[in-house]
């Protein structure tokens, strides 16, 4: 998968097109990610210890990974990702600026 938890991304298609956010969780086996503030759904929750009131809560639902594009750390624009070997480690880099994404 070309994105990881903590990456800043932009949604490139769907009802939330153009929104930016940070990846909160990634599910590589399902090819889906949860992005902060994107794809908000209303969920009916039973009363529980954490939520004694119950009722309807809004939370982020997973979206397909092909709908998000990482943001270039230098320019802040969406960019494609490439891979290269640096000091014997495989790292991701932004195709637009050449900036390395992995610390």
From Swiss-Prot:
The keyword Repeat appears for this protein: no
GO molecular function: rRNA binding; structural constituent of ribosome
Keyword Coiled coil: no
Keywords, sorted A to Z: Ribonucleoprotein, Ribosomal protein, RNA-binding, rRNA-binding
Membrane-spanning ranges: none
Gene Ontology CC: one annotated term: ribosome
SMART domains: KOW
Biological role: One of two assembly initiator proteins, it binds directly to the 5'-end of the 23S rRNA, where it nucleates assembly of the 50S subunit.
Subunit composition and interactions: Part of the 50S ribosomal subunit.
Protein name: Large ribosomal subunit protein uL24
Species the sequence originates in: Geobacillus stearothermophilus (Bacillus stearothermophilus)
